């Protein structure tokens, strides 16, 4: 009986299934077709998938496919590098043409602690097309980014050998700089966060900027720039934005050796046109005769007499033209890469060399990089990478205004053409007709400085090690998508500088008046007796310059070395998984980093005349000067991120980071930096695609978040002490105030502030991305606003001497920055192989000061609430020129002028500029009186 019932049930189910077959057949259609590219070549391996299901197939070698699809279902056809297309059943098309994705929306973009599809980005993140920088011969990677990404400014670089460019992202939000480094962004290379503020002597350097500039372009895989609240994932150090760099790894295939070599020429585009010798003499004569301050000299007596002017017509000592040369730049890279199913590898070495345009300037650098990624098992991966660089820069020791060689161009440019370099054996000190007017160049001779054996050498060495271990839970159906990763990074950076300077002899004319006595060569056909009686004498200040101030020394040798030792550890749990139309991702990471820097400096002065430049072979006549400093800091951070996407249309991201900094007191160690962003891909909406056909892609973005800064030196919350040799007590019986030797005493370095804490920077951003004309023309528009609050600033006000220390930094500054960015890009191709791109980047930015350390006795130049950081240029307001004495009389009468630039009316001459009487003297309440008839540079300047 039991078996009969089972038999009846089975027959009933079979009949029901047979009866349902026509219905199933009626609701399911077979979709057949072929997928081609724009040249109608088959696309092999294109994915055909029923949206919201796991049902799908791929095209064969001829681009053909077959798929059963129920009525009303959508099918998406996609392939990497092409724009996906969707169709709804029933289907009428059998030939599907996929267009190339010029916008690369499926491209994976590196973001903080991971990657995302470009189409899923919700923040203001710019990517740099690295192919555009591969063939640029430059010693500074930053200089190659100029114009390639919106919202970044690139300044400097490549004008001199070894000079790095600097990058700023958007409008900076700083009221007080710390050595100039904290205006720069944070640099993250292969996951390692480089220190931004490492003290070298009395200045700060950004190790990340140096590491970025030293990268060989041939090893760079991607560059991403975080400009808005998306940078909050890096917390405390990301207030000025973040630049993320990923270097290349080996790709599946046989070993591949590649060579890339570039040669470049560095030369001037234009040069200011200077007066020739004759014009120079005529100008100085005119200036002399119009100078109202030369009351003791007959104004009709010219500086250069007519016979001198005639001779100067044939004098043309253009030293800049003599020494300027086109400079060669070259870069060579050799890379080896490859991969198997079990491992990938990449190794490379490169050499860069750059000569200078003036004299003995040169810079060269070696780079190396080697890394391997190993698949230990199906679910375990490991990687290790070693990289570094060694650079050397040589410059002459310029002794004009300091030891820097930066003034050589301006000095040669303004060199009067009538003055030669040498007269016989005498090296001439180049300067103009009067000492006071050209005191900054009166002891300069380019040839002597290039060949006297003095030098300034800088050597840098950087080594980095990155290692990681990853475990994938893909074997577990419940934990699929979860990965655990541990990374360790270490960098050692060394900077050495050697300076060697000796005295040198320059000469100039003993007398400076009379016919023929302004020239260094006899005048042909004239009475040269005055010249023959003129003697040369030694310029007594032709001596080395130390620490930007002239010292009465005969020479010096200095050495300095900075070593920075840093490490970073991360433990990260990352999860990414799709559930139908839902895509979920997230990560949690613990990060610890420490930095230790040591600086050593030594200098000895007044060696005997001959030396090999080695300190142990020189007998010194002075006590060596030495300095040693050591700094350390550490950070502990917790990072979290959550991403959600529905049907690639609705995008949401939450970020949070909690940082600790030992720069603050223990109760203020921690800062919390969250952010949220959202995006809506409007062009994915069915109603949009049916009604708006001229827009191919449209996405709206919005973000808001908090970042911070620890803008101070370490241990300011603890009382620290220094020593002072000159202000200690004096013991003895003498009644003189400074008799005897002062005892060395301890002093407070600064008052403490345990309440000092993180700066806060709230960042808001609205973005719009849209493409038209078959995705060939794209626009990206961003508007941003940043509220900088509780900024840690110093007080300029003096404190009572009884305090015994300078005032501490306090969190009170407020500054707003804002701007708009627009990027327009046209991408197209001619024929099958020729592709081109035209890109325009533009924008506007500004700032507004709300609270800062206002001047206690403000002047009209003082900052006021609502002012910009950049106050522009101040100067006198010119309203004309005195062309006659009648003009002078009318001006003095009309405006009741009693004093004009320190002169009475009788001393004012035609040819002088007319300045406006803007205001009077400053009043007791801080305001200024109206025009008072006194025109002076102190009270009458305006913002030009």
Which residue ranges define each predicted feature?
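Long, charge-rich C-terminal accessory regions
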Residues: 504-505
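Conserved small-residue
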Residues: 258-312, 514, 716, 723-728, ...
């Amino acid at each position: 009986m039991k078996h009969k019932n089972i038999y009846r049930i089975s027959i009933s189910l079979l009949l029901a299934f047979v009866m349902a077959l026509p219905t199933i057949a009626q609701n399911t259609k077979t979709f057949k077709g072929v997928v081609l590219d724009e040249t109608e070549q088959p696309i092999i391996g294109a994915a055909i998938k029923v949206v919201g299901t796991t049902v799908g197939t791929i095209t064969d070698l001829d681009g053909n496919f077959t798929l059963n699809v129920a009525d009303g279902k959508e099918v998406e056809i996609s392939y990497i590098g092409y724009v996906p297309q969707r169709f709804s059943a029933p289907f009428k098309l059998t030939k599907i043409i996929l267009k190339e994705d010029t916008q690369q929306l499926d491209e994976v973009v590196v973001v903080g602690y991971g990657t995302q599809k470009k189409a899923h980005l919700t923040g203001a993140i710019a990517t740099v097309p690295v192919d555009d920088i591969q063939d640029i011969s430059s010693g500074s990677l930053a200089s190659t980014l100029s114009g390639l990404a919106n919202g970044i400014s690139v300044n400097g670089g490549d004008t001199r050998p070894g000079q790095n460019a600097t990058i700023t992202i958007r409008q900076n939000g700083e009221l007080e700089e710390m050595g100039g480094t904290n205006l720069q962004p944070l640099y993250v290379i292969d996951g390692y966060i480089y220190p931004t503020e490492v003290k070298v002597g009395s200045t700060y350097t950004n190790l990340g900027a140096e590491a970025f500039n030293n990268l060989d372009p041939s090893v760079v895989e991607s560059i991403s720039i975080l400009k808005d609240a998306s940078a909050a994932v890096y917390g405390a150090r990301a207030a000025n934005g973040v630049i993320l760099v990923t270097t290349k790894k080996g790709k599946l295939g046989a070993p591949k050796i590649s060579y890339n070599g570039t040669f470049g020429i560095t030369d001037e585009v234009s040069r200011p046109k200077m007066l020739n010798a004759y014009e120079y003499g005529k100008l100085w004569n005119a200036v002399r005769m119009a100078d109202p301050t030369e009351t003791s000299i007959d104004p009709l007596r010219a500086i250069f007499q007519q016979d001198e002017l005639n001779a100067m017509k044939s004098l043309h000592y253009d030293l800049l033209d003599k020494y300027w040369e086109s400079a060669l730049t070259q870069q060579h890279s050799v890379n080896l890469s490859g991969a198997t199913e079990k491992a990938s590898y990449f190794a490379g070495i490169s050499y860069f060399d750059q000569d200078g345009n003036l004299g003995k300037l040169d810079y060269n650098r070696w780079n190396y990089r080697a890394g391997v990624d190993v698949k230990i098992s199906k679910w375990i991966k490991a990687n290790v990478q070693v990289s570094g660089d060694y650079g050397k820069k040589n410059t002459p020791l310029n002794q004009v205004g300091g030891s820097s060689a930066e003034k050589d161009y301006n000095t040669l440019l303004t060199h009067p053409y009538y003055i030669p370099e040498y007269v016989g054996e005498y090296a001439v000190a180049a300067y103009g007709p009067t000492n006071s007017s050209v005191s900054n160049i009166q002891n300069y001779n380019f040839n002597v400085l290039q060949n006297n054996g003095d030098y300034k050498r800088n050597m840098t060495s950087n080594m980095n090690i990155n290692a990681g271990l990853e475990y994938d839970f893909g074997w577990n159906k419940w934990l699929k998508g979860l990965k655990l990763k541990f990374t360790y990074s270490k960098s050692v950076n060394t900077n050495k500088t050697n300076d060697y300077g000796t005295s040198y002899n320059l000469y100039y004319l003993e007398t400076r008046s009379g016919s023929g006595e302004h020239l260094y060569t006899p005048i042909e056909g004239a009475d040269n007796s005055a010249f023959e009686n003129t003697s040369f004498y030694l310029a007594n200040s032709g001596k080395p310059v130390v620490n930007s101030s002239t010292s009465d020394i005969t020479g010096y040798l200095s050495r300095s070395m900075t070593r920075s030792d840093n490490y970073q550890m991360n433990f990260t749990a990352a999860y990414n998984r799709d559930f139908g139309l839902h895509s979920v991702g997230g990560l949690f990471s613990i990060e610890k980093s420490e930095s230790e820097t040591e600086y050593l400096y030594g200098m000895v002065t007044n060696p005997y005349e001959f030396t090999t430049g080695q300190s142990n072979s020189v007998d010194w006549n002075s006590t060596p000067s030495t300095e040693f400093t050591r700094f350390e800091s550490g950070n502990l951070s917790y990072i979290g991120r959550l991403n959600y996407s529905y049907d690639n249309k609705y995008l949401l991201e939450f970020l949070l980071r909690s940082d600790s900094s030992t720069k603050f007191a223990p109760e203020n160690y921690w800062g919390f930096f969250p952010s949220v962003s959202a995006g809506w891909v409007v062009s994915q909406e069915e109603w949009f695609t049916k009604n708006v056909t001229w827009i191919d892609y449209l996405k709206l973005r919005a973000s808001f978040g908090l970042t911070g800064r620890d803008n101070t030196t370490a241990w300011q919350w603890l009382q620290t002490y220094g020593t002072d040799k000159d202000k200690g007590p004096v013991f003895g019986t003498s009644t003189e105030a400074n008799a005897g030797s002062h005892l060395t005493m301890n002093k407070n370095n600064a008052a403490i502030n345990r309440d000092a804490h993180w700066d806060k920077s709230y960042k808001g951003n609205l973005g719009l991305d849209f493409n038209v004309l078959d995705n060939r023309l794209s626009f990206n528009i961003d508007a941003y606003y940043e509220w900088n609050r509780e900024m840690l600033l110093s007080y300029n006000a003096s404190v009572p001497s009884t305090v015994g220390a300078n005032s501490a930094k306090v969190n009170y500054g407020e500054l707003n920055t804002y701007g708009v960015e627009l990027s327009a890009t046209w991408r197209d191709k001619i024929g099958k192989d020729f592709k081109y791109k035209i890109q325009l980047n533009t924008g506007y930015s500004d700032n507004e000061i709300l609270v800062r350390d206002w001047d206690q006795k403000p002047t009209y130049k003082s900052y006021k609430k609502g002012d910009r950081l950049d106050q522009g240029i101040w100067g006198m307001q010119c309203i004309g020129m005195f062309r006659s004495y009648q003009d002078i009389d009318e001006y003095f009468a009309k405006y009741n002028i009693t004093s004009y630039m320190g002169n009475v009316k009788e001393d004012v001459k035609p040819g002088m500029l007319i300045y406006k009487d803007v205001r009077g003297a400053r009043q007791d309440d801080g305001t200024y009186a109206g025009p008072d008839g006194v025109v002076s540079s102190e009270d009458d300047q305006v913002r030009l």
